[in-house]
Amino acid sequence: MIISLLLLVFPITYLLSFSYSIKAVWAGNYGHLSVFLVAGLPIYITSLSILHSNGLDAVIPLFQYSKELWVLLTLGLLVYRLPALPTWNWLDKFMITYVIYTAVFVLLPIGTFGVVEKVVAFKNISFFPLLYFIGRLLNPELLWISKLQKQILILAVFAAIILFGELLTNTHFQTITGYSSFYDKYFLFDPTGNYGLSWTFEIEGGIKRFASFFANPLEHAASTLITIALLVIGLINQRQTKEPQLLLWAVLASVLSIIFALSRASLAGYLLVSYLFFQLIRQRKILF
């Protein structure tokens, strides 16, 4: 009971990051836009699982559509406040075509799904193209890049703390958040694998893969690659870094995460980024 109540810090954090980001965007303070992206989205599934396990299913729909509301409101305000539309490049046109193409299938009588199911699927598919246009229309000068980097590094450290707890107890964090029950009820996915979660949480031989507070180990590994890219930038500009201790902790956190997420692709990416880093700083002897 106590653990369940303590875990509510995740949905509360999600809600606070959403509210703070919406308020900032409404006021035109786009420098705070990243708060929801960094502090909210990574714990989205975990927050929903915890709400479900605490019997708070009534508020889950509000959380489920919050990210779409954030995207639509942010994009709408950006377009409304634009002095003039930008010149569209080939990637912009590709994204627009993609959204229109997928929207057509909502109206066409194809497949066994009803209109509601198609609209929900379209909502999920369109999320990242709309997110792309937010980044496309944002003026980079309005963003606080250094704060964004710091937020991502702090996220990596917190992820490693949860991961360290998983390693000490040899227990997936998702087993106490209600992950399996949530997926079974809302997505009709029966628990699979040796640990009652899904096969994604283990590799051959039943060796555990850990996800920290992310939705699954693959998402955990992918987020670590973003952290690594920022670490490379920070290490190259180490003399200008105002948070050397945070940089060090983030390095340790990324190593821990990339090892125990057990993702071959992410490990290869980690080694590739490390190789490029040593090439950039002209320390080729370390590589051999």
Which ranges hold each PLM region?
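Transmembrane helix-loop junctions in multipass membrane proteins, especially transporters and channels
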Residues: 53, 83, 110-114, 140, ...
